Amino acid sequence: MKIPSLVGPDGKTSLREYAGYHGGGGGFGGQLRGWNPPSESADAALLPNYSRGNARADDLVRNNGYAANAVQLHQDHIVGSFFRLSYRPSWRYLGINEEDSRAFSRDVEAAWNEYAEDDFCGIDAERKRTFTMMIREGVAMHAFNGELCVQATWDSDSTRLFRTQFKMVSPKRVSNPNNIGDTRNCRAGVKINDSGAALGYYVSDDGYPGWMAQNWTYIPRELPGGRPSFIHVFEPMEDGQTRGANAFYSVMEQMKMLDTLQNTQLQSAIVKAMYAATIESELDTQSAMDFILGADNKEQQSKLTGWLGEMAAYYSAAPVRLGGARVPHLLPGDSLNLQSAQDTDNGYSTFEQSLLRYIAAGLGVSYEQLSRNYSQMSYSTARASANESWAYFMGRRKFVASRQACQMFLCWLEEAIVRRVVTLPSKARFSFQEARTAWGNANWIGSGRMAIDGLKEVQEAVMLIEAGLSTYEKECAKRGDDYQEIFAQQVRESMERRAAGLNPPAWAAAAFEAGVKKSNEEEQDGARAA
């Protein structure tokens, strides 16, 4: 005997399932009944197809304009043209006073700039990149590979002051030795302990050219003294994740299909524009099929040859021209059809915009930035869009670019202290090895926030500072500047103007006040109109 049970409003679904979360059930009408993805850990979902997924992302970045633009946006908005060090050792924890800390910071920043931005690229083992270029490459690498890798090296043959160098390592070179399968403690080229912490990395030689034997080198994560040996930065999504997932995974299929759609649309437009007119001839079905598919006997072949010869002789004597005002008579039975231009869009632009909005959401950038189309934006929507993207880029700067930069900076600072290029304050209660994080604490200033309306941006900064809600340091950092450099330059300029007998630039303040007044009046007029 079947035990009766309560059912939902549809008369089929059990009430228990209907009252619970619908995402785990069959869905309204059973749409979700065939959707049964396996429950997997991050590594189980990522690593089996890891190389293929990254290869597809590489192909997109190399051959797809929107993908290349997405990576370029990460580089320009996270790093910019100069990744500036703002050194801030934790002076309270280290037991030194603030004045000694600031003096030490100035010495360190001066020495670091000399080392990091050397035009001869002494910081790079390949002698191709400055420090800012390495950070830009790391951010790009993280965007389409989901992680970045840098090896700290020591140049024992150099005659330069600093021997510390760094080598950018492509994530595709980190793999299990001899391409063996993953094990509990070695996954995708990363040797881990039982807690999941990385102990070292297996890095293969460059695979080009392909006939060379492939060798793997094991590089520990840290040296016995605590100095970083291999820098591996990525943002894990859950526990147990060994390698990073690239940002294109969620939109890879759409980007590839959009690429195919664009090529097909372009081919269609070319075909439609290729023929200005066509000539039709009256042939019976059997003759036309023989001409198109080919003739088997010699009699049919001679008919085809004769017909083509007659047409060639006729049109050579009376060619069809569309550039003139006169069209001659055609061969009897032929007709001339002019091909009118057709709309090649046919709703394509709207569909492309929809796809690009989906792709932009998956990549963390705005549609306007990805498509480079700002034609349909007002100031308010542009500001909201820029702020959304800015929050995303600041997170990436903090957890990707700054982590790479801080670890590289720590390697150099250790050598600079050992070589006495900079001297630790005498009253510090911890040595560098005892408090690496405190001595290496630093902020990194990259590109500034995009200014939609320069006047309103400055007004906002002034009002925040005057209200005590912000500082010159924060507001200058938003613009990609160091407030200490700004202040020092202002002092120098004031002294030079005074020495040259020039009056203070009072016109600047007057112009600013006039601009504020005009902006307020425009806002009031707009409010009245609304």
Curated annotation (Swiss-Prot):
Subcellular location, record wording: Virion
Protein's UniProt keywords contain DNA repair: no
One Pfam entry name: Phage_portal_2
Keyword tags: Capsid protein, DNA-binding, Viral capsid assembly, Viral genome ejection through host cell envelope, Viral genome packaging, Viral long flexible tail ejection system, Viral penetration into host cytoplasm, Viral release from host cell, Virion, Virus entry into host cell
Post-translational modifications reported in the UniProt record: Proteolytically cleaved by the viral protease during capsid maturation.
First and last residue of the signal peptide: none
InterPro entries, alphabetized: Phage_lambda_portal
UniProt-listed GO biological process terms: symbiont genome ejection through host cell envelope, long flexible tail mechanism; virion assembly
UniProt GO molecular function: DNA binding; structural molecule activity
Keyword DNA-binding set for record: yes
Recorded GO CC terms: viral portal complex
Feature type site, description Cleavage: 19-20
HAMAP family for the chain: PORTAL_LAMBDA
Reported function: Forms the portal vertex of the capsid. This portal plays critical roles in head assembly, genome packaging, neck/tail attachment, and genome ejection. The portal protein multimerizes as a single ring-shaped homododecamer arranged around a central channel. Binds to the terminase subunits to form the packaging machine.
Record text on subunit structure and interactions: Homododecamer. Interacts with the terminase complex composed of two small and one large terminase subunits.
Family statement: Belongs to the siphoviridae portal protein family.
Protein name: Portal protein
Gene symbol of the encoding locus: gene 4
